[in-house]
Amino acid sequence: MPYIYLIIAISTEVIGSAFLKSSEGFSKFIPSLGTIISFGICFYFLSKTMQHLPLNITYATWAGLGLVLTTVVSIIIFKEQINLITIVSIVLIIVGVVSLNIFGTSH
């Protein structure tokens, strides 16, 4: 169950980040509200995850996969450009997250 919580936390963090970009500095009501609600749900499920998994694994997985998925959203939805350094960095983040989950300590 903790990994289900983590998936929900990551998903809502990515959704919240997209809403945050769309809110244009909290100047648009609906995207601003979406940001607040999404991050509220995100942190609730992140805290539920931390009841079962170590902080280092939880946070690294949440932050790393959140960054990767947010980058994908930024490319697809917001038409942002990336370069080779960005791609290499994302691959390194994925390797780090996978390594922590395979070799990291558990409760």
Swiss-Prot record:
Q: Mind telling me which residue stretches traverse the membrane in this protein?
A: 3-20, 30-47, 57-75, 86-103
* Subcellular location, record wording: Cell membrane
Q: How is its activity regulated?
A: Ethidium export is inhibited by N-ethylmaleimide (NEM).
Q: Which domain of life is it from?
A: Bacteria
Stated family: Belongs to the drug/metabolite transporter (DMT) superfamily. Small multidrug resistance (SMR) (TC 2.A.7.1) family.
Q: What is the effect of changing residue 42 to A/G?
A: Decrease in resistance to ethidium bromide, but does not affect resistance to quaternary ammonium compounds
Molecular-function GO term, any one: amino-acid betaine transmembrane transporter activity
Protein name as it appears in the record = Quaternary ammonium compound-resistance protein QacC
What does UniProt give as GO cellular component? plasma membrane
* Membrane-related topology note: Multi-pass membrane protein
Substituting residue 42 to T results in: No change in activity
Q: One biological-process term from Gene Ontology?
A: glycine betaine transport
The UniProt-reported impact of residue 42 to D/E/I/K/L/P/R/V is: Confers sensitivity to ethidium bromide and quaternary ammonium compounds
Q: Which UniProt keywords apply?
A: Cell membrane, Membrane, Plasmid, Transmembrane, Transmembrane helix, Transport
Q: Which organism is it from?
A: Staphylococcus aureus
| SUPFAM superfamilies the record matches | Multidrug resistance efflux transporter EmrE
Functional description taken from the UniProt entry: Multidrug exporter. Is implicated for the resistance to bacteriocidal quaternary ammonium compounds and ethidium bromide.
Q: What is the effect of changing residue 42 to S?
A: Confers sensitivity to ethidium bromide, but does not affect resistance to quaternary ammonium compounds
Residues assigned to the Cytoplasmic compartment are 1-2, 48-56, 104-107
User: Which residue spans belong to the Extracellular compartment?
Assistant: 21-29, 76-85
Where does the UniProt entry say this protein principally localizes? membrane
